[in-house]
A protein has these predicted regions:
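C-terminal capping/gating helix-and-loop segments adjacent to ligand/active sites or protein-protein/ligand interfaces
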Residues: 446-459, 470-473, 477, 504-508, ...
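Extracytoplasmic/periplasmic substrate-recognition and gating elements
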Residues: 101, 301-302, 795-869, 896-899, ...
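Extracytoplasmic "Venus flytrap"/periplasmic binding protein-like
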Residues: 572-644, 668-679, 776-780, 787, ...
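Glycine-centered hinge/linker elements that transmit conformational signals in sensory
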Residues: 736-766
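Hinge/lid segment of periplasmic solute-binding proteins
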Residues: 532-546, 609-662, 685, 717, ...
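Long, aromatic- and glycine/proline-rich binding clefts that accommodate carbohydrate-like moieties
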Residues: 807-809, 858-916, 920, 948-959
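Periplasmic solute-binding protein
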Residues: 616-619, 638-683, 707-737, 751-752, ...
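Extracytoplasmic
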Residues: 29-504
Length: 959
């Protein structure tokens, strides 16, 4: 009876709510095709490779040349002489061919990435009409970069980062498993007979010369290679040693692989205790599988056998050994050069390439010039990592099934009989426990420092065994079970990051005495005193070093890791280009107080959204409108991005960041339940009872307000009221912004709808979206698109199981869906007291430019990882970030529907009063209309008072 009453209540609530959504009387859209198509991880390349592991390897090569290709009708063309094909975004090239014999073929591509936005070209390979595995879809091809010239110095004597320029040249490369968990190159199993293979270009454009299907390459054992050397008569060269500085590269795969610096050791070459010397390379920038750096090994005196030693430090990934494949003249010489290990250590170390017996392993070099390439790999632990990854997926799937029965807070006095309700649950636990034990055993068999890390895996295996022994305790220990999955996910993510810093590499003969990688005691003492006394003489806050007397002071509301990136950009780009020195400081609050005290900066970047108008109305800021080039500057941003920073018809702030809401959804859960991705608020309401029957819910954004956030954050990103208001055709203020426009019926309807989400449907007001989304308890939620960063990094247990879409909208009379929403962000401003306003404008113009924002976003993300992706307001820089084509399309579509809201003197009272009305309805059961009307009157009284305080003309001066 209670269930019946509950069901009727939900149905009644749904019927009551429908009138509050404009356009819901129109025919409901057919959204069945919008149910996520998700088949688990059965389509991963790791699974594909495992399935064909016992198939015979191919013994011939199939070459598919440009001359034989069939092209898409548009967006692709053959070049003169049929030597290559140019494929634009959206175009494709296709081959029909025959395999004379069944076998496993690896895939190689000869291509040239044409100049574009600088993103990695993405391709999709279709084999006989279908994509064979996930990794063949949106596969990223690397570009090639080099230093534009030698390392130069600024006026202070600090080394500058050399400009990174793209090298447009042909690359002949096998396609690597970018996920890195199969331990091999991408491949296809071909049955004997005719086949079709299509290469589609998903982003950027490229030239394709050929695609080859070839037998898998094998690396010779050290013994085999030694025998080959002996058979060919190669002899060890004597009396040779040369140091090659690691920062002086030949080429590299990514623009972020620029020279870095180390001032912690006087043994680093080159060294200076005070000045910045770009003397190392790598660190966290060089950590993703497939990234590579190449070196020109010149001045080799004669053909023969040489040894290679690296001076390195791996202090970024604590307790982890990282790995590199070393290629010499295009191939890995022997097993010793495959997965060369670099163990963790806080100090500098040396590593000579050794064979399986621990003896130095030689490599054959020719006289003159040779090429050495180092490529990031995951090492010998890749199979164990794949096993852990598979277990994480299965354990997470089982957790979702259990929560659908018990809910998020199980009744501790009830026996849910989960082992009976979920057929095969205990068998699944046993299977995963065995898999984890096997993964741990593999780690232990490899030995070394990695042995201790198997404890992270064993802990979850033991937890599963405990649940098998006592099934009735499962519901009481769900949180512990979930914590175990999260721990495994964190462990796996940490293992896939492979950072390494290098000072130099040495090519030498056997028996040569190598320089010590570490400084002596007296060198360390000297270094300490030199740096200590320099700290009293050097101004480390002022960067640039031009010696200009018209330098500027900039305060940045930004993280300390990010401020270092800005300093690098100022030193390497802004000051050399303009001759203007910059004093940078991290300051997050106190702009008004500092300005009133006469101690404020010349420029502030990252200023909170509500502050520019707050300062402009007090005559504390300069407007940008009178500067030449301002009209072009505005084109860098979306149409309404400058609206929050305009006052009395002038612009006082330039957008730095811009954020907005997106809808996040779990592909696996929605697919299993047959639920479509909600496109309208009607869809949301129809989805609620389906989820609630399985103890799940939907998350809507709401931020608790405070005095500070009311001023700083503005109106757009606090909750859904602004979104609903805009979709209903409403607005916050009248034309001259002297009063609100919240007395309209659109405003009342939006407020009522927003309140009903919580009063009628019981949506949670405050919750941890990341955690509940990861666990599956909240498979649909609306949050800032920055949540993408968090989920990409921290929620490895649901990697590939979630997606992102525009926010739900309101159906218009013409049947289209209005997904308008408000936004949030920060700005750059120039203070009126600035001594050199023109220099300040040049800085803001430079800082918000396409190139600077792109360089900044790239550097920050490579330093902090995907979790540090910067929410730039610059459209070109935003598009250059490593989104997939689908992600960028979704974000761009939603961004085009962001309508920024104006800020006015007293607007802090608007967000506070609307929140007061909302909480009165939610907690005190007040009448929505009466409460909203009362607070609206209070808002207008405060706006009028504020205008009188600032001496504004009530009749027409506007804001």
């Amino acid at each position: 009876m209670k269930r019946l009453q509950s069901g009727l209540s939900v149905l009644l609530a749904l019927l009551i709510a429908l009138p509050f959504f404009p356009g819901t009387t129109a025919a409901a859209q057919d959204t069945d095709q919008n149910v996520p198509d998700y088949s688990g991880r059965s389509d991963s390349f790791a699974r594909y490779a495992a399935a064909i592991a016992d198939r015979p390897a191919a013994d011939t090569t199939i070459s598919l040349n440009a001359a034989d290709a069939v092209l898409s009708p548009t967006l692709s063309e053959k070049l003169e002489g049929d030597s290559a094909v140019r494929v634009e975004t959206g175009g494709y090239v296709e081959w029909t061919f025959s395999a004379d014999k069944s076998g496993v073929y690896e895939i190689g591509l000869s291509y040239l990435a044409s100049a574009g936005k600088g993103q990695k070209p993405q391709i999709t390979l279709t084999f006989d009409g279908s994509v064979p595995y996930t990794e063949a879809s949106h596969y990223e091809l690397s570009r090639v970069y080099r230093d534009a010239g030698p390392i130069e110095k600024n006026a202070k004597g600090d080394d500058l980062i050399p400009e990174q320029v793209e090298v447009e040249r042909w690359q002949d490369r096998p396609l690597l498993d970018t996920a890195g968990l199969s331990g091999r190159n991408l491949c296809l199993y071909l049955e004997e007979g005719a086949h079709t293979l299509r290469l589609a270009c998903e982003s950027e454009s490229l030239y394709v010369r050929s695609l080859s299907l070839f037998p898998g390459t094998t690396v010779s054992s050290d013994a085999e290679k030694a025998a080959s050397y002996q058979q060919n008569g190669y002899q060890s060269v004597e009396g040779f040693l040369k140091i090659y500085q690691a920062e002086k590269t030949l080429e590299k795969s990514d623009v972020v692989l620029y020279p870095t610096y180390d001032r912690t050791s006087p043994a680093t070459i080159p060294y200076d205790p005070v000045r910045i010397r770009r003397n190392t390379i790598g660190k966290g920038n060089w950590s993703e599988p497939g990234m590579w750096i190449s070196y020109l090994i010149d001045d080799i005196p004669s053909d023969g056998l040489y040894y290679i030693t690296f001076k390195f430090r791996q202090a970024d990934a604590i307790g982890v050994t990282t790995f590199r494949n070393v290629y010499v003249n295009g191939s890995i010489p022997s097993k010793a050069y495959e997965n060369v290990s670099f163990p963790y250590g806080v100090d500098w170390n040396q590593k000579t390439v050794v064979d399986e017996n621990g003896e130095p392993c030689p490599v054959y070099l020719t006289a003159g010039e040779n090429e050495l390439l180092m490529e990031v790999s995951l090492g010998p632990y890749v199979e164990a990592m794949r096993m852990v990854d598979d277990s994480i997926y299965e354990l997470n799937r089982l957790y979702t099934q259990m929560v659908m029965i018990t809910g998020t807070t199980p009744d501790s006095y009830r026996d849910y009989e989960l082992d009976k309700e979920i057929p095969g649950l205990l068998d699944a636990f046993r299977e995963q426990a065995d898999a984890l034990y096997a993964a741990a055993a593999l780690f232990e068999s490899l030995g070394g420092e990695e042995k201790s890390q198997s404890e992270d895996i064993l802990g979850m295996a033991r937890r599963l065994e405990s649940l098998i022994r006592d099934p009735r305790s499962i519901q009481k220990r769900l949180s512990s079970y979930r914590e175990g999955i999260s721990a495994l996910s964190s462990w796996l993510y940490d293992r896939t990051s492979q950072p390494l810093e290098m000072d130099y590499l040495i090519v030498h003969s056997a028996g040569q005495e190598l320089p010590s990688p570490r400084a002596s005691f007296w060198q360390q003492v000297s270094h300490f005193f030199k740096t200590f006394f320099a700290s009293f003489l050097e101004d480390y806050n002022t960067v640039g070093g031009s010696g200009s007397e018209e330098g500027i002071t900039v305060w940045a509301n930004i993280g300390r890791d990010q401020i270092q990136v800005i300093k690098n950009l100022v030193v390497d780009q802004f000051t050399p280009q303009t001759g203007i020195d910059v004093t940078l400081s991290v300051v997050q609050t106190g702009f008004i107080e500092a300005t009133l005290a006469g101690r404020g900066p010349d420029v502030a970047i990252g200023m909170a959204r509500g502050q520019p108008v707050n300062l402009a109305c007090r005559n504390a800021l300069l407007s940008f409108d009178s500067y030449g080039g301002f009209e072009d500057m505005k084109k860098r941003f979306s149409d309404t991005a400058l609206v929050p920073y305009q006052y009395n018809g002038k612009t006082y702030g330039i957008p730095c960041t811009q954020t907005f809401f997106m809808l996040f959804y779990r592909k696996d859960i929605l697919s299993e339940m047959g639920i479509a991705i909600p496109q309208t608020w009607t869809d949301i309401m129809e989805t609620v009872p389906k989820l609630q029957r399985s103890h799940m819910t939907i998350g809507l954004p709401y931020a608790v307000i405070s005095a500070a956030t009311a001023v700083d954050n503005g109106l757009g990103a606090k909750d859904l009221f602004a979104t609903l208001l805009l979709q209903n055709g409403g607005t916050f203020y009248n034309e001259d912004h002297s009063a609100t426009a919240l007395d309209s019926e659109a405003s009342m309807s939006a407020f009522k709808t927003w309140s009903d989400f919580y009063t009628k449907y019981g949506f949670d007001l405050v919750y941890d979206f990341y955690t509940r989304f990861s666990t599956g308890e909240m498979p649909i939620g609306i949050a800032s698109y920055e949540m993408f960063n968090t989920l990409s990094v921290a929620a490895q247990e649901i990697r590939g199981l979630w997606g992102m879409a525009p926010v739900p909208g309101t159906i218009r009379e013409d049947g289209t869906v209005d997904t308008s929403e408000a936004g949030a962000g920060s700005a750059a401003v120039i203070f009126k007291k600035a001594a050199s306003p023109d220099n300040c404008y040049r800085f803001v113009d430079w800082w918000t430019s396409d190139k600077t924002q792109t360089d900044f976003c790239t550097a920050v993300e490579n330093q902090l990882g995907p979790g540090g992706r910067y929410a730039t307001a610059n459209l070109a820089a935003f598009s250059s970030q490593p989104w997939s084509p689908e992600e960028l399309e979704m974000l761009t579509t939603q961004r085009e529907n962001v309508i920024e809201l104006p800020e006015i003197p007293g607007s802090y009272y608007v967000s506070r009063s609307i929140d007061n009305a909302f909480r009165a309805v939610l907690y005190d059961k007040k009448n929505p209309r009466e409460t909203f009307e009362k607070e609206n009157r209070n808002i207008n009284e405060e706006i009028a008072r504020k205008r009188r305080e600032l001496g504004l003309d009530n009749e027409g001066k506007g804001r």
